């Protein structure tokens, strides 16, 4: 895994964060499953896609066909995703991105990105690397590795953690693919998160 500190220019980080604030709580529980496609050579539609293009250059995935991106929004007391492999979930054959990556917008209690050395159909994981959420930190790893998000205690998530939910963990997840994953729309095609383009909704809490 490769970790880059101070990955993006701060004005771009702020504009991207402001755009995300505009969508409020839209699809908050489904945010990890609301993904978009940005083809190579595309003109960004808003600040978040500008950030995707900037991260793409840092990742070095120059020959990829495009980037699949989504907003990872969750409270670390109630993580909505288990450990998993990134893959073309609607495709007929198992296919993984060339690279997976996570950009962090803020620091939170727990919420570490955890990446194992386990690959599909391989032996069980023998090694685990973690990256704590910090503003403007960017983590890049091979797209076929088992990974997940730890909870507020820094443990594998299970039941909801009791106590105050704390700050919302906010990330931009970008996967780089040799070919477009099946059925993933562009942001313009999707009809969701219109606030990213400028129309304001209720603020995130």
Indicate residue ranges for each PLM-predicted region.
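Eukaryotic intrinsically disordered, low-complexity regulatory regions
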Residues: 201-205
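Non-heme Fe(II)/2-oxoglutarate
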Residues: 1-70, 77-80
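Catalytic core of non-heme Fe(II) oxygenases with the double-stranded beta-helix
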Residues: 63-68, 72-197
